[in-house]
A protein has these predicted regions:
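N-terminal cap/leader regions of alpha/beta-hydrolase-fold enzymes
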Residues: 1-181
Length: 181
């Protein structure tokens, strides 16, 4: 998605386990309206192309199957390629951030620790507490959005996240009481 003004900073949107579905496209369009050049890469392309699942029990099982086969290292390579591609576009003014949801939220954390985005934002990222050893490698400002009732990031995980980054002024963690994944 490209803003009406034609140019802007780059933003990569990291998909949930449901693929590049209507919700991810709507988020991309919203941020394009706000002035960003947005790319939503298909992170499941190695498993099957164009995964677009709904938020129902049947599709959740399918999504979880893809998630179980997902290779994080290859995903980071794909994100690196996506960042380079976005930066090369005439429409992109050069800086690129990464914002992800669920699986994409986990990838936001890994992108911040392994690549060099301008900023990274994680919405209900899964499995981050198990990867806190990567925290010293985060080189950009980062925001974590953590729902209180998220079974994939329980309160003890959020506490560990806070403890890991308590000395970092450039990392913010927001809680959402009563909210679920």
């Amino acid at each position: 998605s490209v803003p009406d003004c034609g140019t802007g900073p780059g933003l990569i949107i990291g998909q949930e386990i449901f693929g590049v579905n209507k919700t991810m496209r709507q988020i991309a369009d919203y941020f394009a309206e706000e002035g960003y050049v947005v790319l939503v890469p298909d992170m499941f392309w190695r498993l099957t192309e164009r995964v677009e699942l709904a938020y129902n029990e049947k599709d959740f099982k399918t999504a979880f199957g893809y998630f179980g086969k997902f290779d994080l290292d290859l995903a980071i390579e794909d994100i690196s390629i996506s960042m380079d591609k976005l930066k090369s576009l005439d429409e992109c003014t050069g800086s690129v951030g990464y914002m992800g949801f669920c699986l994409g939220g986990k990838l936001a954390y890994l992108t911040a620790s392994k690549l060099e985005p301008e900023v990274a934002i994680s919405f209900y990222g899964v499995g981050i507490p198990e990867m806190l050893d990567q925290g010293n490698n985060v080189t950009c400002p980062m925001i974590f959005h953590c729902p209180e009732l998220d079974e994939w990031m329980p309160p003890e995980g959020v506490k560990a996240l806070r403890n890991a980054f308590e000395s970092r002024d450039d990392i913010e963690i927001y809680d959402y009481p009563g909210a679920d994944h």
